Regions:
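Extracellular polysaccharide-degrading/modifying enzymes targeting complex plant/algal/animal polysaccharides
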Residues: 1-174
Length: 174
């Protein structure tokens, strides 16, 4: 469905009080491996993902697409917006650094430790949705034959408001 203007962005969608799942592609395991746990924090590798052939591409709305990954360690998950994808070299860069290197999990075999969210290719089950903010389009696969009239995206007008005035003049660092 066409949204009110381009550029409208949100990362969650609701049907009444029920949170709807964002479109999720099939999971994969990164093709790179951390050479040593002591190197897992090395800053130069926190934005780089080496991925299997066919799992990522340079989507037209790449800034809407997120990588969800267990980076090197199994006890946490990062949601990272993609910055660039080179499908030929199979290297992606994220706009935000991961907590650890974006490599496969050390010392444990997983069938999938990463997946992509918010692409049309991932929209494969009823109740899922994907957003293309560049085109101002929301794609939703309803759970029933027709979509509910209670579909909403949360919005925030302001995060913090400070009002009033100080009784004393401020000097120095504040």
């Amino acid at each position: 469905s066409k949204l009110m203007g381009q550029g409208l962005r949100f990362r969650s969608l609701y049907d009444g009080e029920e949170r709807l799942d964002r479109a999720r592609a099939k999971g994969f395991v990164p093709t790179s491996e951390c050479p040593s746990p002591s190197l897992a924090h090395r800053w130069e590798y926190l934005h780089t993902l080496h991925f299997p052939e066919g799992t990522l591409k340079n989507w037209e709305n790449l800034d809407d697409v997120e990588l969800v990954i267990r980076p090197t360690q199994q006890w946490l998950i990062n949601y990272l917006p993609l910055k660039s994808v080179d499908a030929e070299k199979r290297i992606a860069k994220t706009a935000v650094a991961g907590t650890y290197r974006l490599d496969r999990v050390v010392r444990k075999k997983w069938e999938e430790t990463a997946w992509i969210e918010n692409t049309l290719e991932g929209l494969d089950e009823p109740g899922e949705w994907a957003l293309n903010s560049r085109k101002g389009l929301l794609y939703y696969w309803p759970k029933q034959e027709r979509p509910s009239k209670n579909i909403t995206a949360p919005g925030l007008r302001e995060l913090i408001r400070i009002e009033g005035k100080n009784n004393e003049a401020l000097t120095g660092d504040v």
